[in-house]
Swiss-Prot record:
Record keyword Methyltransferase present: no
Family indicated by similarity: Belongs to the class-II aminoacyl-tRNA synthetase family. Type-1 seryl-tRNA synthetase subfamily.
Chain positions recorded as L-serine binding sites: T231, A232, E233, E285, S385
Enzyme class per UniProt: ligase
One of the record's GO cellular component terms: cytoplasm
Function statement: Catalyzes the attachment of serine to tRNA(Ser). Is also able to aminoacylate tRNA(Sec) with serine, to form the misacylated tRNA L-seryl-tRNA(Sec), which will be further converted into selenocysteinyl-tRNA(Sec).
Catalytic activity: tRNA(Ser) + L-serine + ATP = L-seryl-tRNA(Ser) + AMP + diphosphate + H(+); tRNA(Sec) + L-serine + ATP = L-seryl-tRNA(Sec) + AMP + diphosphate + H(+)
Subcellular location: Cytoplasm
Protein name: Serine--tRNA ligase
EC identifiers of the protein: 6.1.1.11
Molecular functions per Gene Ontology: ATP binding; serine-tRNA ligase activity
Amino acid sequence: MHDIRAIRENPEAFDRDLERRGLSPLSAELIALDDARKGAVSAAQAAQERRNALSKEIGAAKKAKDEARAAELMAEVARLKEEAPGLDAAQAQAAKVLDERLAAIPNQPKADVPLGADEHGNVEYRRFDSSRARLAEGRQHFELGEATGLMDFEAAAKLSGSRFVVLKGPLARLERALGQFMLDLHTGEHGYTEVVPPVLVRDEAMFGTAQLPKFRDDQFAAGDGFWLIPTAEVPLTNLVRENILAEDELPLRFTALTPCFRAEAGAAGRDTRGMLRQHQFNKVELVSITAPEKSAEEHERMLACAEAVLQKLDLTYRVMTLCTGDMGFASQKTYDIEVWVPGQQTYREISSCSVCGEFQARRMNARYRAKEGRGVGFVHTLNGSGVAVGRALIAVMENYQNPDGSVTIPSVLQPYMGGLNRIEGPNT
C-alpha cells in the first residue's frame, strides 16, 4: 500500500519508480482521487460546522423570542440532517475508491534493483559449488521416485487430480527429515522463533500481505471468508497486524513449516510432470519484522540463512537478483536462490527472499514506537523461503542419485532418518 502523502510530495519520483516496473504514470490520477476524497471530507465537515453554528443561532433566536427566525433556522438544520448520511456515504466512497486504487499498485523497487522486463533481466549475485562433482546427466526425480514405487502420481490423481503426489516409505521420511532439519537450523543457529500457525486465514490477512485482491485467482478459497494459505508468509507476517511494537522488540524473526496451497492459474503447460509445480506442497518460511533502517541488513541476513540450508546439504546453487519486471507485487527487492537440477541440466528456484519495506505494514497497520520520542512509524517486513521442502527433495534426489537408481542421503539428514544412509533403487 502506498502513502498518498508521499506521492503528493514527490509525484515525479513515484512515476519514475512505476515506469521501472513497466507501468504508466499514475500520480496525477491518484492525486485527483485524493482531491475528491478531501473535497468529500470538507463538504461533510462544512455541513457539520454549519449545523453547530445553527444550533447556537437557534438558541439566540429563541432567547430573543424571534420564533419565525428560530423556525427558519430549525428547518435548515433538518435539511442538513437529511443530507448528512449522503455526505458521509460520499466521503466513505471517495476514500474507498482511493484505497482500492492504491492497493492495486505494486511496490516501488529499490534503486539498485536491475532494470528488466522479465526473468532474462535477472542478474547473478553469487553462487556456491558443491564439493561433489556436478552430474553431467541424470534421471529426473519423478523417474527415480516412480521406479522405486515411493513416488505415486497416479494414486494422487485418483485422490485429487493433477499436480499432487503421494510419497511413501523412506521417501516420505526423507521429505519429513528435510523440513525438520531446516527448522532445527533456523531455530538453533539463526535465531528464528518457530511458530505453528493456522493454514486457514481470513480476507484481511490475505489483503495484509497483498495476495488479495490482485491475486485472487491464484488462491484456494475455503468459503465463509477463509483462504488456504499460499505460503506461511501470510499468517507469520500478520502476527503483527494492528499492533504497535516497541523498537526494543525488533527485529522479530519467525519461522514455520506448513503446507502451502496454490491454484497455479497461470501455469498451464509448465512443469506438468513431477513435483516442481504442485497445488499442495510443504515449505519452511522465514519472516522478519524490523525497524526501517535495519531492513536492508536483515535482507542480506535472511538470504544467508536460506543459503545455509543448501550449503549444509552440499547442493550447487546460484543467487539471482530479480529485475524490476520479474519481482513480486509486494517486493522492493528480491533474491532468488536457484538450485542445480541435474535431471533438467539447469537451475530451478528453491527460495525467494524479499524485502517489502512498509508496503505490507501499511496494509496491516503494523507499527512501532521509536526510541527517544521519535514517534510512531510503520515497521518493515521481509519474507523468504527457508526453503521449499518439495524442491529440496527434488534437488537431493537428483544430485545424490546413483547409477543403480538408489539415492544417497546427505550426511546432515541421516540423523533424521534413523541412521539410514541411502534409499534403495529398483535394482539394488
